[in-house]
């Protein structure tokens, strides 16, 4: 996270304007500009655990990770720099949360890639902080306004839910497959054997649908779920509770906070990080799985058929199987044997 994103490069064109400002950085913080920009004071709030990991090393307690920002997170700030995410409901949640806490008169900057839909910030904030475009470069837009009225923020109003085969799935903005079960997860679910036992880890759990569906036909499994996203962690907890399923849920950057070994690791790993395609998480998942599987345990993942996972699976486990596939997706299985590299 040393190279700056295009959005940060646009902000750097205005770095002189920020030297006397007490800035809160928030939104899609994909680099460490919040820790490096010359300001009077800097804070950062993120819903992404992996971004908090990087920023907290340099900013300490001034970098915060949570679903909802609190008054302490924005204390003494007179400027908000908000990085627009690719997901508009996510931006709505975060901006309404932050603007409900910041004092009237706060300088508001919104920056983002044009293809992410950053233009819609003008309409979203029209009643609270009317924005004007002040720069356009690197296929990004930078908008500025001043907070004129605090919105009323109620996190409960952002919850959604849907049903899958009689199961209730709770969701929040920014959670993968917020509006329904994706095709890849459906394919992975179709391969899970009823009456499975043992410890199961769901990495990148999203709204928790894989785990609750698995637990319904295999009630003796012991579930652990993790995700980098604070909305996903909270959504998974709510999904488990809504279906009467027990499990431990926590934030983790793939295996960073995971302890112990499991009989099965399941995942529909992400390959988009913000607006960029990224295979890092899935490759970290495959290579790290051998340190968290019991002997004879298995890794089972679903992925777009075009992604180059077979080589990483073979390199790590010695072999792999494709146990289900469609034109777009494949479900891979790899077993922890003596052939597997022990990490």
Curated annotation (Swiss-Prot):
One of its GO terms (cellular component) is cytoplasm. One of its GO terms (molecular function) is 16S rRNA (guanine(1207)-N(2))-methyltransferase activity. Coiled coil: none annotated. It is an enzyme of class 2 (transferase). Pfam families: MTS, MTS_N. It catalyses: guanosine(1207) in 16S rRNA + S-adenosyl-L-methionine = N(2)-methylguanosine(1207) in 16S rRNA + S-adenosyl-L-homocysteine + H(+). It is found in: Cytoplasm. Keywords: Cytoplasm, Methyltransferase, rRNA processing, S-adenosyl-L-methionine, Transferase. Its EC number is 2.1.1.172. InterPro entries: DNA_methylase_N6_adenine_CS (IPR002052), Mtase_sm_N (IPR013675), rRNA_ssu_MeTfrase_C (IPR023543), RsmC/RlmG (IPR046977), SAM-dependent_MTases_sf (IPR029063), Small_mtfrase_dom (IPR007848). PANTHER family: RIBOSOMAL RNA SMALL SUBUNIT METHYLTRANSFERASE C. Specifically methylates the guanine in position 1207 of 16S rRNA in the 30S particle. Monomer. Belongs to the methyltransferase superfamily. RsmC family. This is Ribosomal RNA small subunit methyltransferase C.
